[in-house]
UniProtKB/Swiss-Prot annotation:
Broadest EC class assigned to this enzyme: lyase
Protein source organism: Mycobacterium marinum (strain ATCC BAA-535 / M)
Pathway annotation from the record: Pyrimidine metabolism; UMP biosynthesis via de novo pathway; UMP from orotate: step 2/2
Protein name: Orotidine 5'-phosphate decarboxylase
Family: Belongs to the OMP decarboxylase family. Type 2 subfamily.
PANTHER family in UniProt: OROTIDINE 5'-PHOSPHATE DECARBOXYLASE
Length: 278
């Protein structure tokens, strides 16, 4: 299988540079006249799968599935399988992070050969970038991707992410370490896009420099959270093709009509299409 970085680049080139979120928040379920149950969750996801067919990347927010226990995970597995059947890359927004054997277990679940394994997964480096090594290695071996939190769109994140770490912000340190990992892998795999990226929020002031990342940049916070699609170009010194804007509520609030959700997604895609320009 081709590495995630190359698959992502191809998907964006053919289907546009947009990541659509599946965030089945209880308030959205109510707005869609669905019960806040596993059955309501499944119905919500069925609508999203149908509406998002043919787009490049879809990002299920794992926490909203976990809330329903085993039944929620069953819905997540089915949703991921259905998205893949439609040719969509699946990014599991799980934000996992731990050490040693526990991190290895997360790696097996999300980047190995389990029913939950996604094309890519988000992770937290709070326990140190080196703690992510088990998952990074499993993801690389299985041609999957990883997005490491660096500078997030929530205002509370700045307290830690903008702290000084030997002359660099913590966010910049994370970006630089991801860049080094991509360089190491590139020496073995050859000149293809890196499969490990970072998360940099659309509303972050003074974002880290990602010009040397060698991988993709997931950009949440577009739409309802205040990030403007037209203002993303050059974020952190990124090349346009590096950026992958992510949007959820701005699109999902158009539901429950499949056609209306899809139309909202297409409007958002039109607004970020300039990021595909060579």
């Amino acid at each position: 299988m081709t590495g995630f970085g190359a698959r992502l680049a191809e998907a964006k080139a053919h289907r546009g540079p947009l990541c659509l979120g599946i965030d089945p928040h209880p308030e959205l379920l109510r707005a869609w006249d669905l019960p806040a149950t596993a059955d309501g969750l499944a119905a919500f996801c069925d609508i999203c799968v149908a509406a998002f067919a043919g787009f490049a990347v879809v990002k299920p927010q794992v926490a909203f599935f976990e809330a329903y226990g085993a039944a929620g995970f069953a819905v997540l597995e089915g949703t991921m399988a259905a998205l893949r059947a439609n040719g969509v890359l699946v990014l599991a927004d799980a934000k996992r992070g731990d050490i040693g054997s526990t991190m290895a277990a997360y790696a097996a679940a999300w980047a190995g050969d389990s029913p939950l394994a996604a094309d890519a997964v988000t992770v937290s480096p709070f326990l140190g970038f080196g703690s992510l090594r088990p998952l990074l290695e499993v993801a690389t071996a299985n041609d999957r991707g990883v997005f490491v939190l660096a500078a997030t769109s929530n205002p509370e994140g700045a307290t830690i992410q903008r702290a000084d770490a030997d002359g660099r912000t913590v966010a910049q340190l994370i970006v630089d370490q991801v860049g080094l990992f991509n360089s190491e892998v590139g020496e073995v795999t050859g000149p293809e896009p890196g499969s490990v990226g970072v998360v940099v929020g659309a509303t972050v002031l003074n974002p880290p420099d990602v010009s040397g990342l060698g991988g993709p940049v997931l950009v949440p916070g577009v739409g309802v959270q205040g990030g403007r699609p037209e203002a993303l170009g050059g974020l952190g010194g990124a090349a346009p093709q590096q950026l992958l804007p992510a949007v959820s509520r701005e699109v999902l609030r158009a539901g429950p009509s499949i056609s209306e959700v899809r139309a909202a997604a297409e409007r958002m895609l039109d607004s970020v299409a300039y990021l595909s320009a060579v």
